[in-house]
Design a protein with these regions (language model features):
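Expand to "…catalyze enediolate/carbanion chemistry for C-C bond making/breaking, isomerization
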Residues: 1-142
Length: 142
């Protein structure tokens, strides 16, 4: 379970991801949203869920960027409508529409670049990132 953000830009992050991870992001965003609607079980206490808690609208924006890039690469997407509906619901609920405070934190994004390099070194080497491939994830949770 992970939402990869090698960049503070959702669209740029989507463009950077390999197909395997890009496709999974859409599904994992849905799983995180569903987990946030529960009080126990599943992924409720996973750090990826906790870091987006209170920022559901931004998670949907991130997911939309993943869906757009997925379609741009020629794949079919069946999740964009789910995220659009969720945004409407969250706006109606008065949820926080602002980006999370960790977006733009260089140590956070560097940890994601590092882990992407570890997972698929041949693919991610093209970006010339300076991070070593062994940094731990930075989980911005309390």
């Amino acid at each position: 379970m992970q939402t990869f953000l090698p960049s503070p830009s959702y669209a740029e992050s989507a463009r950077m991801l390999d197909n395997r991870r890009l496709g999974k992001q859409r599904v994992e965003c849905k799983q995180i949203l569903l987990a946030m609607s529960k009080t126990s079980g599943g992924w409720v206490n996973h750090p990826a869920t906790k870091m987006w808690r209170g920022h559901e609208i931004e998670l949907c924006r991130y997911a939309h960027a993943m869906c757009r890039e997925w379609v741009q690469r020629g794949y079919k997407d069946n999740l964009a409508v789910f995220f659009a509906d969720a945004v409407l619901q969250f706006h109606g609920d008065g949820r926080n529409p602002y980006p999370p405070p960790w977006l733009g934190d260089e140590s956070f994004h560097a940890s994601h670049r590092s882990n992407l390099l570890r997972k698929a070194p041949d693919y991610y080497a093209r970006y010339g990132w300076s991070e070593p491939a062994d940094l731990p994830y930075v989980w911005p949770i309390q």
